[in-house]
């Protein structure tokens, strides 16, 4: 909503989004933790620079549930790295939804890693490790079975910094926008170089959320 004072407009925060009916189906047993996380993100997210002022009005559908849709694709008992975790999207949401998975949240900014540690503690999550680092600096923490990322960068930039974190045969799980097919085409040489194969783009949340969630899913083969 725009508010005008002496002809100058500025954006004002909308009210918090009400919990959608789809939250129960998507989060299941983790619904209460999802509610607590969402409430904390609404309360602190804008002040800490984790989400923009307009995102409060769509925090459930565009952020929390969008992230939680990836949970069924995680390997049971596996190790997951979330690159550029920021507010914990998708990594912290996946950690609360899948307590059987060890999740490492990789984030270079101190105020964000402070938030991630504090929020993990508030939620009582014991399967989370927070690592203040760039992806390129996090290789010693691996190898991981899977790597996630959301709103970090285009594939041609993202693949070279994430593929080295994986074990041979590990998976890339990236939340992407409507132009993901164009990104795949633009990254063809990079994908070949890093032995990325079995590429699929899955549309998640159809009929559950207002916007389709696109998941780029691929396997990283063994190095020669």
Roles of regions detected by a PLM:
Residues 1-81, 97, 111-128:
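Class I SAM-dependent transferase core
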Residues 11-13, 17, 87, 105, ...:
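Compositionally biased, intrinsically disordered/low-complexity regions enriched for serine, proline
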Residues 38-43, 88-89, 130-131, 157-160:
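Short hydrophobic/aromatic-rich motifs at helix boundaries and adjacent loops
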Residues 55, 90-92, 183:
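Residues at secondary-structure transition points
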Residues 83-85:
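Conserved beta-strand/loop positions that form the S-adenosyl-L-methionine
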Residues 87-100:
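Conserved SAM-binding loop of SAM-dependent methyltransferases across substrates and taxa
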Residues 98-224:
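S-adenosylmethionine
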């Amino acid at each position: 909503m725009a508010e005008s004072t002496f002809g100058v407009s500025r954006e004002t925060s909308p009210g918090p989004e009400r919990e959608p009916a789809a939250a129960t189906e998507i989060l299941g047993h983790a619904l209460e933790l999802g509610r607590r996380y969402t409430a904390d993100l609404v309360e602190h997210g804008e002040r800490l620079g984790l989400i923009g002022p307009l995102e409060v009005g769509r925090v459930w559908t565009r952020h929390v549930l969008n992230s939680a849709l990836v949970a069924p694709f995680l390997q049971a008992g596996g190790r997951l790295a979330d690159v550029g975790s920021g507010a914990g999207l998708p990594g912290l949401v996946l950690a609360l939804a899948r307590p059987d998975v060890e999740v490492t949240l990789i984030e270079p900014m101190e105020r964000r890693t402070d938030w991630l540690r504090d929020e993990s503690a508030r939620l009582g999550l014991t399967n989370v490790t927070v690592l203040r680092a760039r992806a390129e600096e996090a290789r010693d923490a691996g190898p991981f079975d899977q790597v996630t990322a959301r709103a970090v960068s285009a594939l041609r930039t993202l693949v070279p910094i994430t593929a080295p974190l994986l074990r041979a045969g590990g998976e890339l799980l990236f939340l992407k926008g409507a132009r993901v097919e164009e990104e795949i085409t633009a990254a063809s040489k990079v994908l070949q170089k890093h032995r990325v194969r079995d590429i699929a783009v899955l549309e998640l949340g159809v009929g559950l959320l207002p916007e389709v969630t696109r998941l780029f899913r691929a396997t990283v083969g063994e190095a020669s």
